[in-house]
Amino acid sequence: MFINKTNDGRNNICGQQISKYRTQLNISQRELADRLQINGLDIDKNAIQRIEAGKRFVTDIELIVIAKVLNKSFEELLDI
């Protein structure tokens, strides 16, 4: 059976990078959620918190919008 988790139990591999780049921009999780909503992504602060903690999956569409708002490439968010 295939399990969709990293070896350390996280549900995504981009949460730590999202947190890092958000912090570098000096914006809160709520502000990031607001900016994502302006860009058409229906997401709230709690979802951002869960993504950064590795507790929530991130779709490819979400990743693209998050990268755009953080002014990064999706590759940078995936740390590849």
Where do the protein language model's features map onto the residues?
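Phosphate-coordinating loops and pocket residues in cytosolic domains that bind phosphorylated ligands
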Residues: D79-I80
